Regions:
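Short amphipathic alpha-helical segment within the helicase RecA-like ATPase core
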Residues: 1-251
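Glycine/charged-rich beta-loop-alpha catalytic/anionic-binding loops adjacent to active sites
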Residues: 66-73, 169-173, 243-247, 253, ...
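A glycine- and small/hydrophobic-rich beta-loop-beta segment
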Residues: 292-327
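Gly/Ser/Thr-rich helix-start
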Residues: 220-224, 250-252, 256-259, 277, ...
């Protein structure tokens, strides 16, 4: 689903709109009187009296064109809790082809920094879908309109969360690709695209890896017709030459186990053996998009572990980059 978040001044037609309000953990709603009609207030108040207040979210359908959503912001929430609340909200309203909701930011009662920013961030992350190879693609749209003058995320906060979301979605796209598409050759090509984000990308192919003495990494990919690679991704956002933070991720695009073959019931999942590298790649993209004031380097090894006449055998001995031999 495509989610678009807009910041507007007011609702054009409050009689035919789905409106979201925040309350405290006791679902006190007196602060809503100025936002709804008397009949709507009384109706919601009566329904709450017979509701299980242990829940976080209530959706009340006032008529065929209007819903009222109440969301409880409990005390002592962490930022992860707030993001999970946004994800839960998305799960409650994620139906139908197109929909539109108005979030009244003035009703945020929780005293948390960037509460609404984290809430919307959780919603966006939950909305991720991978339908690239679906025969029938159905486009669905969700418009989230934030109204009110209080508690709106600042422009800087919006930029931060957008960068995090793009990095997360890039990583999820990589993990979701099947092994016959995202093999090491294709993976390396896609990482070159990060250069447009002002990241420095260096790709070491098999010839360079052999020269460096990285025979341990090369050994894993010996049985594949695809190449093996080491990729470094650098972000230099600090003003000084401080030592970078380093992130290393495993990028085995498919791991059969080699001659120590994986059990058949687990084999299909071995396409996810590159998820560690995807996390590193997504992180580096996010750092670049938010122009983080740090120096960082991401390192990923990209290989495919297959069975063939030239694959590495159990008991083989190779020499690693450090000079140590490994059996």
């Amino acid at each position: 689903m495509t989610v678009k978040i807009n910041y507007i001044k007011k609702i054009t037609n409050k009689f035919a709109a789905n409106v979201v309000f925040f309350t405290n953990e006791k679902f006190s709603i007196n602060h809503l009187k100025k936002h709804v009609t008397n009949s709507e207030f009384n109706y919601i108040n009566d329904l709450l009296k017979s509701s299980d207040l242990k829940k976080n979210i209530f959706v009340y359908e006032l008529n065929s064109k209007k819903k009222i959503v109440l969301i409880s912001a409990k005390n002592n929430l962490t930022t992860s809790d707030i993001e999970n609340l946004g994800a839960e909200f998305y799960g409650r309203i994620n139906y139908g082809k197109n929909s539109e909701y108005f979030i009244n930011s003035d009703t945020v009662v929780a005293k948390y920094d960037d509460f609404l920013g984290h809430f919307l961030h959780g919603l966006k992350l939950k909305s991720y879908e991978f339908k690239k190879y679906k025969s029938k693609k159905e486009d669905r749209f969700l418009s989230i309109n934030v109204i009110g003058n209080k508690n709106k995320p600042s422009a800087q906060t919006q930029l931060k969360f957008k960068a995090l979301e793009e990095g997360a979605f890039f990583a999820r796209d990589l993990v979701s690709e099947p092994g016959n598409i995202l093999h090491p050759d294709e993976y390396a090509k896609r990482l070159i695209s990060l250069k447009k984000n002002r990241l420095k990308v260096n790709i070491y192919d098999e010839k360079k890896l052999r020269k460096l003495g990285m025979h341990s990494l090369l050994g894993v990919g010996m049985g594949s017709v695809r190449g093996s690679y080491l990729v470094t991704i650098e972000w230099n956002g600090a003003k000084n030459n401080s030592r970078p933070l380093a992130f290393v991720g495993k990028g085995v695009t498919f791991d059969t186990g080699g001659y120590s073959l994986k059990p058949a019931r687990f084999m299909e999942d071995m396409t996810y053996d590159m998820a560690g590298s995807a996390a590193v790649v997504g992180l580096m993209k996010s750092l670049a998009l938010r122009k983080a004031k740090i120096n960082a380097v991401g390192v990923v090894g990209l290989v495919e572990n297959m069975v063939s006449g030239i694959a590495q055998r159990p008991g083989d001995i190779v020499k690693s980059y450090s000079g140590k031999t490994i059996e």
